[in-house]
């Protein structure tokens, strides 16, 4: 019996430690592109699902923090104005910190409840609960400038007379060779001349 217990103990010690919820918790990187004067968060639904939060609640927070208007269209989030991937990623991180992560055990196993009209974050892992803060809207400056050497996710809106695909980012027309209308691509801007920009494909993302 002692040999059995010793063998069992050795086996348990040799087993790798199970990964906790925190280690499994991964937030998708925001995938954005521009349509006219709007910013489209193409994987909005996937992000809300990963956070285990109501998409409407997440969207309301993002609109307030970005200081803009917008809506949910299917799996996408659409925002008025031009916002960088980093700007949106920063606000998602702020949402996670306030509405997802437990302040005691630092795990994401939480849910939102209302107690006496106060919105609370309750942790399923450790049982802790806390009120969430009422946040004031912050003015976030939307960027509409593209830069040489930078890579952007673009939606090809038309094809020029020479066969190059054309994407629009605010006042800029970006020419991307070997692309077709409706295609979404990642392209690196090689040259900017006035409001015209010339880019080359880095990756094809598919059709819109």
From Swiss-Prot:
All copies of domain TRAM, residue ranges: 145-203
Residues passing through the membrane, by range: none
Keyword Magnesium assigned: no
This protein's UniProt keywords: Initiation factor, Protein biosynthesis
UniProt xrefs under InterPro entries: IF2/IF5 (IPR045196), NA-bd_OB-fold (IPR012340), TIF2_bsu_arc (IPR004458), TRAM_dom (IPR002792), Transl_init_fac_IF2/IF5_dom (IPR002735), Transl_init_fac_IF2/IF5_N (IPR016189), Transl_init_fac_IF2/IF5_Zn-bd (IPR016190)
GO-annotated molecular function: translation initiation factor activity
Similarity annotation: Belongs to the eIF-2-beta/eIF-5 family.
Function: eIF-2 functions in the early steps of protein synthesis by forming a ternary complex with GTP and initiator tRNA.
Subunit structure: Heterotrimer composed of an alpha, a beta and a gamma chain.
Protein name as it appears in the record: Translation initiation factor 2 subunit beta
Encoding gene per record: eif2b
């Amino acid at each position: 019996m002692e040999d059995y217990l010793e063998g069992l103990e050795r086996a348990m010690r040799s087993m790798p430690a199970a990964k906790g919820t925190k280690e499994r918790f991964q937030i998708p990187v925001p995938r954005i592109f521009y349509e006219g004067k709007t910013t489209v968060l193409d994987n909005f639904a996937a992000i809300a699902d990963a956070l285990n939060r109501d998409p409407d609640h997440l969207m309301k927070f993002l609109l307030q923090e970005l200081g803009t208007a917008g809506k949910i269209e299917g799996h996408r989030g659409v925002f008025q104005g031009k916002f960088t991937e980093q700007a949106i990623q920063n606000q998602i991180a702020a949402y996670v910190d306030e509405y997802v992560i437990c302040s005691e055990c630092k795990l994401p196993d939480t849910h939102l409840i209302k107690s006496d009209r106060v919105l609370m974050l309750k942790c399923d892992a450790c049982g802790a609960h806390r009120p969430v803060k009422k946040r004031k809207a912050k003015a976030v400056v939307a960027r509409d400038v593209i830069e040489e050497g930078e890579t952007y996710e673009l939606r090809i809106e038309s094809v020029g007379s020479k066969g190059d695909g054309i994407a629009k980012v605010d006042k800029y027309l970006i020419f991307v060779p070997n692309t077709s209308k409706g295609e979404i691509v990642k392209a690196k801007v090689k040259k900017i001349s006035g409001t015209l920009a010339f880019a080359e494909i880095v990756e094809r993302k598919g059709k819109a």
